[in-house]
Structures are given as C-alpha cells and as structure tokens.
Amino acid sequence: MLLKPEEDPGLPSAYRPISLTNTISKLMEKLVVKMYNQHIQKTLPNSQAGFRPGSEINDQLLKVINPIETAFRKRFITTIAALDVQKAFDTMWHDGLRFKLATNNMPPHFTRWVSHFLTNRSAKVAVHGELSQSFPMKAGAPQGSAISPTLYNLFVADIPQPFHPRVGLAQFADDTCYWATGNHTPNAYRLLNDQLVRYTNWTNKWRITINPDKTQAMLIRPTGRTIDPQKYRVQLHNQPIQYQPTMKYLGLTISNKLSLLPHLRATLKKTKLPLQTIRFLSQKNTKCPAKVRIHLYKCLIRPLFTYATPLLINYNQSQLEKLCLEERRILKICLKLPKTTPNILVYALAGLKPLPEYLNLTNKIYITRALNKPALPDMLHNPHPDTILHKLSLL
C-alpha cells in the first residue's frame, strides 16, 4: 500500500494498493499486449492518448489547449470540466470488461486470456507485521501490472464522444476532460451540460463513480466580457460544480485567462524539497563533488522547469526571466559560486545550455517529431495567430 500525496495517513482511503505480479506474469502480460496491439489500437478512440505507442502528454495538452486558446482569441467563451474518476483502476467492473471485449470484435483468445487473468484474484493487507485474511477481488485491474493500463483503456473505449462540433474530449487513461465553446455563455454552458448528461448516464451504466469534490470546472472568457458564473454552473449528477480561477490538468496549471503564471508558481514551489537536498550536499563538511550536484539538478529540478515544454512558449518575458533567475541561483549553489558570478560563466562551468535556448531546441525537436504523427500535422496547419501552435510553427 502506498500513501497518496498530501493525504492523511490515518485514513484507509489515503492508500493506493499496488500488486507486484511476478516476473513471468509481467513478461506474459507484455507479450500479450504486443501480440494483440493492432486490434487494441483499432478499438481505442482518438480521444484516448494514455499508454499508447507514439503518444505523449504534450500531444494531449496541445489537443486541449489549442481549441480553447483559438476560441479565446476569437473572443468566444469556453466552459471546461476535468473529471475525477474515483478509484478508477480499483473499481473496473470485470464482467463489464468481458462484455465489451466480446462485443468489440477483440480476438476470442485475447478475451479468454484476460478473463482468466482477472478471475479468482485475491489480496491480503499487512500492517505492522500483521496479515489480514485473504479476500476476493471482484473488481479492478491490479495496479502495478503491465497490462492494467491497457485493460482500463479498453474498458472506457466506448466513452460518449462529443455530440457537437464545438464540444471537445481528451482522455489520458482515467484523466478525462470535456469542454465546450460558444459565442455566448449560455451556448457553451448548455453544450457542456448536455455532454455531461450523456457521460454520467454512461458512467452509471458501467459502474464508474465520479468524485464531484475533486472534479474541476472553469469558465474561460476574454477580458471585457462580464458574466455571472453562478448563473451558468456546470452540473454533474444534478450537483453544481463550483467554477475555479485555475485548473490543473495532466500536471499543467492554467488560469481562466489562459495565463501560465499559476503553473510557474506551482513549479517554483516544487523545487523547494530537491533544493534542500542540493543545499545539504553543498555544505563545507560534505565531500559531494560539484559534478554530482549538477547531475542532481538535471535529474530533480530541470525536468520540473521544462515539463510541458511546447506549452511553455506562452510564458511572457517576465515569467521566463523568473524561471531563469531561479535556475541560475540553484546552479550557483551547486557550484558554490558567488552571487555576482556572470551568467555565461555559470552555464559554462555547469556544462548546460541557458534555459531559453534549451526550451527552444526542445520545441524544435518536438515539432519535427509531431509532424510524423497522424493528428498533430492537421493542428499545425494554418493555426490561429498568437496561439501556442502558431508560435511553435514559426520556430
């Protein structure tokens, strides 16, 4: 059992059960997925990007942000809901999955193998050396199993697709996001709520539980358009979801004005803990070489600064400079340099490219890679001016 981040250790619901299947089982699971991968990919909808070959989080983030940003530049309204599936992997209905595999033209051998894989599973819980009695697992895909993400993707493959051109859907495994745009708030609000009714009917049918307390909703509107948010609230199971000024989806935090300032603040906050480790190793009485401290920075902190690199092209000059200042401050700690050390010398001694140069190079590599993917070239063709995709296309 693993404690979930920022949860109360005294609550049983704060722990995530992890199943450590043996090596032979994991090998077999990977072989099965590889053998039937062509059938699996044909079954999954284009909205699903999680745990699929050739897909990455940046693609999905762009798929969500691009239509919303385009609507924003056209002074349209967008309502968006990021849905939280409660214990998604742990509550997957076994018989429901069997039915879907059998009716989606999956090979019978694959369906039977999956059925046997999920049959007669049991678990025990150990706490302080005390072992509970064995109990049957009547639902759920074993977390830690190599095939579980694929099984969950197949289970939710028939998710209700957008019923209107101005409604969008993005999935990354159990992370589900619907949005709707309109020239007026009532239009966007009505489209999204109609889509969510279809979605909740589907979740009820397949025993999927949505946690309304962790579901996020946001109303994105251009400056100057005054709207009463309380009048047009998103509803889930007839329960209103409070609009938030910011939303976090797949690790990216944006505001209702599409600003990345909340993401920058969250990023800088995340650096505090790894920076404490680097500070400790930079003390006089430690014998940790500078090369190791720089390596720790590259492994623990720079990935935080460069997460979702294509989206970071929307940082304004002030926000990017804050990130660069923090990077140089950390590098000076790693190298034990005075605060007045020139920036060129800091990067030369660290053996690193300056952050803006590194981000620019990474984006060029991403665009080259994205042009060979089926969906992104269409998005990159003639993007709306002053959007992320337009800026990327100019690199």
Predicted region positions:
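Mobile genetic element proteins and their domesticated derivatives, centered on retroelements
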Residues: 16, 28, 32, 36, ...
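Short, conserved micro-motifs composed of acidic
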Residues: 131, 194, 209-245
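Non-catalytic, peripheral interaction segments enriched in hydrophobic/basic residues
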Residues: 172-173, 204-227, 248-371
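Flexible, low-complexity interdomain linkers flanking nucleic-acid-processing modules
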Residues: 232-234, 238, 362-395
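Active-site palm subdomain of RNA-directed nucleic acid polymerases
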Residues: 32-48, 73, 149-179
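Catalytic palm subdomain of template-directed nucleic-acid polymerases
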Residues: 88-104, 177-201, 259, 314
